[in-house]
Amino acid sequence: KMQLGDWVALDAEPGSYFGATPTALTSQAYYALSAQLLALAAEVLGNRQDAELYAGVHRQAAQDFAANFFTLDGAMTAQTQTAHILALRFGLTPQKWKQKTIQRLLELLEQQNGHLVTGFLGTPYFCAALSQNGCWQQAYDLMLKKDYPGWLYQVLQGATTVWEHWDGRRPDGTMWSAGMNSFNH
């Protein structure tokens, strides 16, 4: 079965649309999130039986995520920004490894000079994962980066909407791909 994973992440192999975060990890993370949201919706709707059912599915999915994507010493098996973002933002990081996961995300961010290299699955949650874990300054700095890759880089290039690719138009004027390069996402 094909999964798009962290689509158009900058940590992809050259010429690939698929980011470096394993699709098994992104699929499991979003499965857990979906179960959690279903449990919350059922609770709001007053359907206690479904709320309990989906809360149980979420608990099991979170346990499976930890077993599959954390080593015995608490390191994530995938050393990507997206892996750490999803684990933190979706509440899938075991408490005993939370600080280690936060620290590693900050290291991965620093390795990119404070820039993101995430795709469609990691990007929407990056600033929230940072700020919810006390990293307000890093979230603020990330959001306001004016150079490539970053949101304000796109704005300074004349963008009025978010581009499909971070490198839709590179600083040297070249494009990632003329065949698939939407400037309206």
What are these regions (language model features)?
Residues 1-185:
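Active-site core of glycosidic bond-cleaving carbohydrate-active enzymes
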